[in-house]
From Swiss-Prot:
Homodimer. This is Ribonuclease Z. Zinc phosphodiesterase, which displays some tRNA 3'-processing endonuclease activity. Probably involved in tRNA maturation, by removing a 3'-trailer from precursor tRNA. Keywords: Endonuclease, Hydrolase, Metal-binding, Nuclease, tRNA processing, Zinc. It comes from Oceanobacillus iheyensis (strain DSM 14371 / CIP 107618 / JCM 11309 / KCTC 3954 / HTE831). The keyword Metal-binding applies. NCBIfam families: PRK00055.1-3, RNase_Z. It catalyses: Endonucleolytic cleavage of RNA, removing extra 3' nucleotides from tRNA precursor, generating 3' termini of tRNAs. A 3'-hydroxy group is left at the tRNA terminus and a 5'-phosphoryl group is left at the trailer molecule. The gene is rnz. The keyword Zinc applies. Zn(2+) 2 binds at D67, H68, D213, H271. Zn(2+) 1 binds at H63, H65, H142, D213. HAMAP family: RNase_Z_BN (MF_01818).
Length: 306
């Protein structure tokens, strides 16, 4: 599992940062890629990575500002020609995302070659759940409806205790897989094996919290608490805290403070204003690390293993 940052700029593209988009690559786990926001030219950014558009099965839009959605029509259209035929895709987002997508496709006379589902978010809580994953959402504090997403990978069974099985006379073979897949297994001799008796500790699933544009708020702490990864906007540096509040954004230090208060493992800053140039990057990171040492500032095409 890895995070691939496709766009890390705020508001408008710059020479070094495109507008917002980040992919959660889970091809090794569930053979899917999930995309969070889709700013203008996201499909161009994808071309510079190993991500396959047909593997993108879900797109989560945090809010409807243009730097987070203007890349959707182009990506959806191109996916039809990139082995995406008949590969379903679901889009989640605030009220209005359905009208935006359907209107742009209709007016441009774009006919997709795959089924698309659009689900609008109307309340906080559980968005959906599968056998492997669970996604929750929470409204944040921005000028328009903006949401955060908490992605929870479910715990996986521990490793089969092979030595223990051998000790009780069960030789390696297909029976091992049967034991691992079933709570109770009856052997040919009538013996009963309980899976929990021959498995090691469960492998704890990862938790990734990705927040859309927002002001700093302690109300977000319960939603993101104990996440392995927090992706948080860092539009301004701390000397611009009042400006951040006025424009419904956050500073690098505020993001670090939130990560510390919520017992996050790693913080990745993104959504950086174009006012900050290459020579400012070190100070942005240093300011945040004084509060929360496990902080990184994402760049376009940064890839982080989870």
């Amino acid at each position: 599992m890895e995070l691939v940052f496709l766009g890390t700029g705020a508001g408008l593209p710059s020479k070094t940062r495109n507008v917002s988009a980040v992919a959660l690559n889970m091809t090794q786990e569930i053979n899917e890629v999930w995309l969070f926001d889709c700013g203008e030219a996201t499909q161009h950014q994808i071309l510079h990575t190993n991500l396959k558009p047909r593997k993108i099965t879900k797109i989560f839009i945090t809010h409807l500002h243009g730097d987070h959605i203007y890349g959707l029509p182009g990506f959806l259209s191109s996916r039809s020609f990139q082995s995406g035929e008949n590969q379903p895709l679901c889009i989640y987002g605030p009220i209005g995302i359905k009208e935006f997508v359907e209107s742009t496709l209709r007016l441009s006379q774009t006919n997709l070659t795959y089924p698309i589902t659009i689900k609008e978010i109307t309340e906080d809580g559980n968005l959906f759940e599968t056998n492997e994953m669970m996604v929750e959402t929470k409204k944040l504090q921005h000028g328009i409806d903006s949401y955060g997403y908490r992605i929870k990978e479910k715990d996986k069974p521990g490793e089969l205790l092979v030595d223990k099985l051998k000790q009780i006379g069960i030789a390696p073979g297909p029976i091992y897989q049967q034991i691992k897949e079933n709570e109770i297994t009856t052997l040919d001799n009538g013996s009963i094996i309980y899976r929990n008796d021959v498995l090691g500790p469960a492998k704890k699933g990862k938790v990734i919290s990705i927040l859309g544009d927002t002001r700093y708020s302690i109300d977000h702490i319960p939603f993101i608490k104990f996440s392995d990864i927090l992706v948080h906007e860092s539009t301004f540096t701390q000397d611009k805290e009042l400006l951040a509040f006025e424009y419904n954004h956050s500073t690098n230090v505020q993001a670090a403070k939130l990560a510390k208060e919520a017992n996050i493992n790693k913080l990745y800053l993104t959504h950086v204003s174009s006012r900050y140039q290459a020579e400012d990057i070190d100070s942005i990171i240093e300011e945040a690390r004084k509060i929360f040492p496990s902080t990184w500032l994402a760049n376009d095409f940064s890839v982080y293993e989870i």
